[in-house]
A protein has these predicted regions:
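A short, active-site helix/loop in glycosyltransferases that binds the activated sugar's phosphate group
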Residues: 36, 123, 136, 140-172, ...
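Nucleotide-activated donor-binding/catalytic signature segment of Leloir-type glycosyltransferases, i.e.
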Residues: 247-274
Length: 385
């Protein structure tokens, strides 16, 4: 049960596609129930069922919205129908779909695998209502209820500690999503620089991802003048912009764009991202808060480029000072971290080589497939118990 538009090139659908691909390679038969929006994908053993779309929605934004709530209700109705017509080994439910799935799985006597890509209470922190008593307490209790009802929680890297604290008796694993190092020809990187209007020798600092508030892009924008004071030729590329994201960055970003030192690039297909990452001299993740590790960190590591990231527990779930420069989530600290890499090419090479080695050892496809097999074998044992 996936309450997302599938398939689209954005965080959770990307992760889910990898899980479905692995399950197919392992010979599992999977019925995916998802929103009525997105492109179909084909893997042996996979059937895709889509919830009804009575309002004829063509898109659904990231985050909470009335549109998403209506589609969630449609997904629940479809889930009841699927469980009434088929016999399943387990229910694998993502994000908010896990709450109704917990009740449905119990009613049908099958295990619940809760795929915790993020903490819902954490994601709702950006809304004012989430801070009005007793809403925070109620959200925490709802999350704890779900965690204690799940037979197995598979959480985004960084969330395992939260699960163990809230539900000590629940089995929990953390995802390590695959990202294979890829070789991008130097000529391709130069061509991309030309297309973006970047000088061939300008140091490039690149961010990729959403423009949500928790990503810390405000601090990154504030850090740019400090970086330019030390490295005047530096250029910043932010990939993933949409209209709302551009507006949220404010006037400071507009001034930097006019000055030619900042380029905002709309969301790119996943297949295009290796070229952007290879072009960069520094990859940056200024994330301010949130317990779930962003998928881009796995791609950053595989790219073999030096990483500057905020020193928060989310990043530390995978990154170390051997593979990244970890700094405080503040503009001056981000600037100092970026400049330290630009001024020491040998340090940048060491960080990039260590990052790529980590990806080679820990983020390979076969290793991921084995982990998915272990997860579903656990669920199968529980179904037979």
């Amino acid at each position: 049960m996936a309450p997302q538009p599938f398939y689209q090139d954005r965080g959770t659908p990307i992760a889910l596609r990898q899980v479905l691909h692995a399950a197919s390679e392992l010979g599992y038969r999977v019925d995916l129930l998802t929103f009525p929006i997105g492109a179909d994908v084909e893997f042996p053993g996979l059937r895709i069922f889509r919830a009804d779309n009575p309002f004829d929605f063509r898109a659904v934004p990231i985050g909470l919205s009335l549109r998403k709530l209506l589609l969630d209700a449609s997904l629940l109705a479809a889930a009841r129908g699927r469980l009434a017509s088929e016999t399943y080994t387990c229910v694998h439910a993502l994000e908010e779909a896990a709450w109704p799935a917990a009740l449905l799985a119990r009613r049908h006597g099958i295990p619940l695998l809760y795929d915790m890509q993020s903490s819902i209470p954490e994601q709702l922190r950006k809304y004012m209502l989430a801070h009005v008593p007793p809403v925070p307490m109620l959200m925490a209790r709802a999350e704890q209820w779900l965690l204690t009802r799940a037979d197995l929680v598979v959480a985004s890297a960084g969330l395992g500690t939260r699960v163990r604290r809230m539900a000590p008796g629940t089995r929990v694993r953390e995802w390590r999503f695959p990202s294979a190092p890829s070789e991008v020809p130097h000529e391709a990187s130069l061509a991309l620089r030309r297309r973006l209007g970047l000088p061939a020798d300008a140091p490039v600092i690149l961010y990729s991802g959403t423009f949500e508030a928790y990503q810390g892009l405000g601090e990154l924008i504030a850090a740019i003048p400090e970086v330019l004071a030390g490295e005047p030729s530096a250029r910043f590329i932010l990939v993933g912009a949409d209209r709302a994201g551009r507006a949220a960055l404010g006037g400071a970003a507009e001034e930097l764009e006019r000055a030619g030192v900042l380029t905002l690039v709309e969301r790119q297909p996943r297949s295009a991202m290796p070229g952007y990452l290879a072009m960069a001299d520094v990859l940056v993740s200024p994330r301010a808060f949130g317990g779930n590790l962003p998928l881009k960190i796995f791609d950053y590591l595989a790219a073999g480029r030096p990483i500057v990231a905020t020193n928060i527990s989310t990043h530390r779930a995978v990154l170390t000072r051997r593979t990244a420069v970890l700094v405080e989530p503040a503009a001056d600290a981000l600037a100092q971290g970026i400049v330290s890499v630009l001024r020491s090419p040998s340090k940048g090479r060491e960080l990039g080589e260590a990052a790529r080695q980590y990806a080679f050892e820990h983020l390979g496809w076969n290793r991921f497939v084995r982990s998915v097999g272990e997860i579903y074998e656990d669920a199968h044992r529980r179904a037979l118990a």
